[in-house]
Swiss-Prot record:
GO terms for biological process: anaerobic cobalamin biosynthetic process; methylation. It catalyses: Co-precorrin-5B + S-adenosyl-L-methionine = Co-precorrin-6A + S-adenosyl-L-homocysteine. It comes from Tolumonas auensis (strain DSM 9187 / NBRC 110442 / TA 4). This is Cobalt-precorrin-5B C(1)-methyltransferase. SUPFAM superfamilies: CbiD-like. NCBIfam families: cbiD. Keywords: Cobalamin biosynthesis, Methyltransferase, S-adenosyl-L-methionine, Transferase. InterPro entries: CbiD, CbiD_sf. Belongs to the CbiD family. Pathway: Cofactor biosynthesis; adenosylcobalamin biosynthesis; cob(II)yrinate a,c-diamide from sirohydrochlorin (anaerobic route): step 6/10. It comes from the Bacteria. The gene is cbiD.
Length: 378
């Protein structure tokens, strides 16, 4: 186990969570120890590296092998208490000394290949991100000195199977995992890393020339787009609860048309100016629904009944019974107004639309006819 992180924890809601280290740190440590083993011609069972964040990791080495001027070694990925798809897998490096001072880094079995533009790596390259490329080269150069070189191959036998649990397929990374990590350290409960992974898909689609995008909270939204709107799911990007962040990213990337599509219970919060829709941040669903119904002249008895509802689905039954379904269109319109207010100082504002649906995947309302929105997206 890594000694430096043994007592390094973060606190969240009164609980402590142990930090871990990234696939990039694993690859760096594996490459470093394999190089050391070649030079010393002996097996090494522990290796230390300094991560980009300045944290020193002392890591156990698994499956060390030496064969003349080449060696390989593995480091087991430990995500701490942030257990992701790569937690517990072995990341290997094979190092072969060269006759010149060049250091090359490539991906082998289980490391994905980049098949689309937009993630900061050339198409056809291994999915080894910029920071790990730098740390791997620096660690090996430190061991070899300036006069020697090596060919380094990073591989992960479980990578192809593990990658099926990640966003790699959507990002155009095929055949394996990504070797990533800007700090080298995994911080549990980190919203920033989650948000960044979502924004990466936006960046990729913009790099492909796309100017129109659909943002959805999750899988239900994508299903609605596919089944009810008959649109290509390539238009869809998941925003999770980070509505404001993803809208700002879409504005930064100069998308021309952004459509929010989601269940009433999630997107109604945006109509109230709540741009982080997780329940631990804010609720306001019933209050917002009641406000818009009151503006339509709904009777006090309906408002009182809806205020007592625990879910928007329950409220929808009461709304339908009394014929106030128009409220969904007014809420969708208000969502777009809130977004325009948030981005009012933008030098390049995008066109915004909003569509609300129910749990049974049926459209409820929109800021303008859904057929017009679909036509604009084609």
């Amino acid at each position: 186990m890594n000694i430096a992180l043994a007592d390094d924890k973060v606190w969240h809601k009164g609980k402590s969570y142990r930090k871990g280290y990234t696939t990039g740190s694993c690859a760096t440590a594996a490459a470093k120890v394999a190089t050391l083993m070649i030079l010393r011609q002996q097996v090494i069972h522990q290796v230390s590296i300094v991560t980009p964040s300045g944290v020193t990791l002392q890591l156990n080495v698994e499956e060390p092998l030496i064969h003349g001027l080449q060696a390989s070694a593995a480091i087991r990925k430990d995500g701490g208490d942030d257990v992701d798809a790569t937690h517990g897998m072995l990341i290997y490096a094979q190092v072969v000394l060269r006759n010149d001072a060049t250091i090359t880094i490539s991906g082998g079995t289980g490391v994905g290949k980049v098949t689309r533009k937009g993630i900061g790596l050339p198409v056809g390259n291994a999915a080894i991100n910029k920071t790990p490329l730098q740390t791997i080269e620096a660690a090996v150069r430190e061991v070899l000195g300036p006069e020697r070189g090596a060919d380094i191959t990073i591989f992960a036998p479980e990578g192809e199977e593990r990658a099926q649990r990640t966003y790699n397929g959507r990002l155009g990374i095929e055949g394996g995992i990504s070797i990533i990590g800007t700090t080298g350290i995994v911080t549990p409960m980190s919203e920033e890393s989650w948000k960044r992974s979502l924004a990466l898909e936006l960046e990729q689609k913009r790099a492909q020339g796309m100017e129109k995008i659909i943002l959805v909270p999750g899988n239900h939204g994508e299903r609605f787009v596919r089944e009810q709107m008959q649109l290509d799911s390539e238009l869809v990007v998941t925003m999770s609860n980070f509505v404001g962040y993803m809208l700002q990213e879409a504005e930064r990337l100069a998308f021309r048309h952004v459509v929010l599509i989601g269940h009433l219970g999630k997107l109604i919060k945006v109509a109230a100016g709540i741009f982080h829709t997780h329940s631990h941040i804010a609720d306001g669903r019933m209050e917002t629904l009641i406000t818009h119904l009151a503006l339509l002249g709904a009777p006090n008895s309906l408002l009182q009944a809806i205020y007592a509802c625990n879910t928007t689905e329950a409220a929808m039954e009461l709304i339908e019974a009394q014929g106030y379904q128009e409220v969904y269109n007014t809420i969708a319109t208000r969502i777009c107004e809130r977004i325009n207010q948030m981005l009012r100082y933008s030098p390049q504002p995008f066109q915004c639309d909003a569509i609300l649906f129910s749990l049974d995947n049926q459209p409820l309302g929109s800021n303008r006819p859904i057929t017009d929105i679909v036509e604009a997206l084609r």
